C-alpha cells in the first residue's frame, strides 16, 4: 500500500481492536484492521466486534473481507487451501451480536449471511492465483480460545460443516446490520482434531501453515480490489430499510443518537428531534 497512515477511531461501543491502517492499493482506498491487535494481543472472546465493524462503517468502508485461519472439517479441504464459505453456524456463547437494543429493536435477515457479489468477486480473484479454492460450505464459529475436543469435532462434522474457526461470528451479523458487504476468505491450516492420520491441531501447526497462506491471501486481495466498484447492486446497502420494528416515536433519544450512523438516513425526522 501507499500513502499509509494509522488512524484511531472512537466508537459508541468502545475501542476497536487497534488503530485502522488506511492507504491506497492500485489507486483504490483501502482500510485494514488487525483484528487481534498488532502483536496478536486479543483472544477471540476479547474482540470488540461492534467497535470493529462500527469503525469500518464510519470510515466509509463498503466491502469487508474477513481473512481467517480455520480448521478443515472435510477431507477434500486440505491445509493451505482457500475457502469462501457461504453459510455460518454461530456456536459462540459470550459475544454481543447486535448494535440494537436499549429501546430500538431491529431484525436483519441472515438467511444468506455472505454478500453474493463480494463472494463471487473474491472467488474470481482467488482462482487467478495458484492456490486451491473452494467456494461455498459452512463455517462454524466456536467460542475458543481452546480448540475443540475430539467429541465436539466429530459432532460438528456430523452436522455437515466445512470449516471451523473462532472469529467470523458475530462479525458477519454485525456487518449485515451495518449494511456492509461481507465475505470471509478462510485459510485452512489443519484438520482440527477429527482426522485419523493427521496430528491434532496445535498453535505450532496453525502458525506454520498460516504463514505459508499469508502470501496467497495478499495475492487474492490485490487481485480483488480492481473487481470492486460502485455502485453496489446487492441488497446489502438497504438491509435496514424495513428491519427496524420499533416505532420512531418510541425511540429513546440517547439510543437514537448512538445509532445515527446506521439508521439516520431512514429516520431523519427522529434525528432532528434529538
Question: Whereabouts are the PLM-identified features?
Answer:
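Metabolite-binding pocket within alpha/beta catalytic cores that recognizes anionic/polar moieties
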Residues: 1-111, 267-274
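Non-catalytic positions within long, well-ordered alpha-helices that form the structural scaffold/packing
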Residues: 57-60, 157, 176
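Short acidic/polar active-site loop segments enriched in Thr and Asp
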Residues: 62-63, 162, 181
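Generic non-transmembrane alpha-helical segments
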Residues: 117, 121-132, 219-227
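Active-site/ligand-binding-proximal alpha/beta "capping" segment
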Residues: 125-162, 245
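Zn-dependent metallopeptidase/amidohydrolase metal-coordination segment
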Residues: 166-204
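His/Asp/Glu-rich mid-to-C-terminal helical/loop segments that flank catalytic regions of hydrolases
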Residues: 193-241
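A short, charged, Gly/Pro-tolerant segment at domain boundaries
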Residues: 233-273
